[in-house]
Amino acid sequence: GFVPEGRRLFPKLTVTENLLLGAFRPTARSAIARNMDFCFETFPRLKERAKQLAGSMSGGEQQMLALGRALMSAPRILLIDEPSVGLAPLLVARTIDKIKELKEGYNLSVLMAEQNFTQAIRIADRGYVIVHGKIAFEGESAEALNNNELIREFYLGA
């Protein structure tokens, strides 16, 4: 499943219609219904807003919808590009927590590009820090979190 930067929803379609667009793999209607139920269980707010136009939702709700749409194809891998873009700090933490829950609870592999290092690395098994187009760090997430020099250089340019 793919969650693009900026969410890339269809603003004039409803939540349900956007979710159905994620069910692009040929599959039985019963599987699509199960996947829809899974999305609504995972993101109860989407069920409340099922008939609402995607373009009228908040940024956090739109991010939930983008994640839900990616889950509609029952993927084994989620590719997520900048999930925190345009979200308030509290929503960033909630979004990252939800990605972690999906990763661990449903055995999904997640490949995520994210500029918010501290949020991304706390759910990662491995991390890569790219500075000016070159890999500045590659390793286990615990190693990255304990590398004060890396963090100082990455955040402060020191």
Listing of model-derived features with the role each one plays in the protein:
Residues V15-R34, T42-K47, G139, A158:
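ABC-type ATPase nucleotide-binding domains, specifically the catalytic core motifs of the NBD
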Residues L53-M57:
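Conserved ABC ATPase signature
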Residues A70-L71:
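ABC ATPase C-loop
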Residues A74:
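Conserved catalytic motifs of ABC-family nucleotide-binding domains
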Residues L78-E82:
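Catalytic Walker B motif of ABC-type/P-loop ATPase nucleotide-binding domains
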Residues A93-N107:
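Helical segment within the ABC ATPase nucleotide-binding domain
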Residues M112-Q115:
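H-loop/switch region of ABC-family ATPase nucleotide-binding domains
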